[in-house]
Regions:
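ABC family nucleotide-binding domain
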Residues: 4-228
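C-terminal boundary and immediately downstream tail of ABC-type ATPase nucleotide-binding domains
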Residues: 225, 229-251
Length: 251
């Protein structure tokens, strides 16, 4: 089992409500540098909401999120725009600007938000596009790309901001089955390179392959967590066992 020392992102007693509905009920979780944490659970368990809380896209009603052991999201003096630059996020819908080329979509945030030089960012963007086998699409428009290609562009766009941590929210859920693998392969490679990642997914085989740790959420709580192989081979709670059984088919 890999050893991880430095905590880079922490959730402390995080509570999230939508009106009377309590979605997250006091979540505690530490994410370590270089660790790949996969969050799984049934629809409506709170996993995607929790992920959005981890980079400040959702306000929380209790507890705190802490970056690098010192930057508290609850502290009003902290600029959430700067915090979000350290925590990249890729969504289920790629949200590329249709009127911009692929390259211009990638260059937009680093040049406008981070005020970096276009030449520097372009060099980085082209390297990343080559890495995900899309260098030849740099001058294409989103409508000319498949869903899998657009999702790989969305990953490159997030990486071009040089984040410390990457969050992935069910990024293959809207893709045709044959396009899923090309996106998951990019994420596997990022994991091998040591990127700190938190991934919400329904792809159980992928979760088992990529995760250092699996978090199983149920009804707004962490019901079970553990090393990936141990969790999938020998889940401790009845709820986790039932959940995993829904992915098993016997003739």
């Amino acid at each position: 089992m890999k050893q991880f020392d430095k905590v880079v992102l922490s959730a402390k007693d995080v509570i999230k409500n939508y009106g009377e509905l309590e979605v997250l009920k006091g979540i505690n979780l530490d994410i370590h540098q270089g660790e790949v944490v996969v969050i799984i659970g049934a629809s409506g368990c709170g996993k995607s909401t929790f992920l959005r809380c981890l980079n400040g896209l959702e306000d929380i009603q209790g507890g705190d999120i802490i970056l690098d052991n010192e930057i508290k999201f609850s502290d009003a003096k902290n600029d959430m725009t700067k915090i979000r630059q350290k925590i990249g996020m890729v969504f289920q819908s790629y949200e590329l600007f249709p009127h911009l080329t692929i390259l211009d979509n990638i260059l937009l945030a680093p040049t406008k938000v981070q005020k970096r030089s276009k030449e520097e960012v372009k060099k980085q963007a082209l390297k990343l596009l080559e890495r995900v086998n899309l260098l030849d699409k740099q001058n294409s428009y989103p409508r000319q790309l498949s869903g899998g290609q657009k999702q790989r562009v969305a990953i490159v766009r997030a990486l071009c901001m040089n984040p410390e941590i990457m969050l992935f929210d069910e990024v293959t859920a809207a893709l045709d089955p044959e396009m899923v693998r090309e996106v998951l392969d990019v994420m596997l490679e990022l994991a091998r390179d040591g990127m700190t990642m938190v991934i919400v997914t329904h792809e159980m085989q992928f979760a088992r392959a990529v995760a250092d740790r699996v978090i199983f959420m149920d009804n707004g709580n962490i019901a079970e967590q553990g090393e990936a192989e141990e969790f999938f081979s020998n889940p401790k709670t009845e709820r986790a066992q039932k959940f995993l059984n829904t992915f098993t088919f016997k003739k």
